[in-house]
Amino acid sequence: MTYELKMPILGFDATKIELEKIDETFSKIRGLDGKQPFEITLINPFSLCDYAFTIPTADERLLDLDESRGDKVEVYCVVVLQKPIENSVVNLMAPFVFNPANACALQVTTLPVAEYPQFSKVLPLKEFLSKEILETLNR
């Protein structure tokens, strides 16, 4: 699905992105306009941990979220893929929020570290995976 970015992603000038779901855990976004083409791999943070945050009011307004309409957002975090995959790192502090109801999206960049200390550092994927899954990945 194509989304309009309500704020540019830091370092990029694209205003339109495509969200492509790979599976229940991984997705990617691709810049559709702008001078620099890009692709960013995303991960569903809810598949990793007990993930919750409050969308800042300014971001809610930009996304035109309306609970009375039943707007439901989709949330993804940036994952930087490494080999082996369990060494990939996840940034939980700057999630992407997508509003499918109006095809708008943005990256939240203003979560206060004091309120979300558990998200304040980039963590390797292996921190979230069970021993069984890690063994499967290493076969």
Curated annotation (Swiss-Prot):
Keywords: Bacterial flagellum biogenesis, Chaperone, Cytoplasm, Translation regulation. The keyword Chaperone applies. It comes from Helicobacter hepaticus (strain ATCC 51449 / 3B1). It is found in: Cytoplasm. InterPro entries: Flagellar_assembly_factor_FliW (IPR003775), Flagellar_assmbl_FliW_dom_sf (IPR024046). Acts as an anti-CsrA protein, binds CsrA and prevents it from repressing translation of its target genes, one of which is flagellin. Binds to flagellin and participates in the assembly of the flagellum. One of its GO terms (cellular component) is cytoplasm. The keyword Protein biosynthesis does not apply. Pfam families: FliW (PF02623). SUPFAM superfamilies: BH3618-like (SSF141457). It comes from the Bacteria. Belongs to the FliW family. This is Flagellar assembly factor FliW 2. Interacts with translational regulator CsrA and flagellin(s). Its main location: cytoplasm. One of its GO terms (biological process) is regulation of translation.
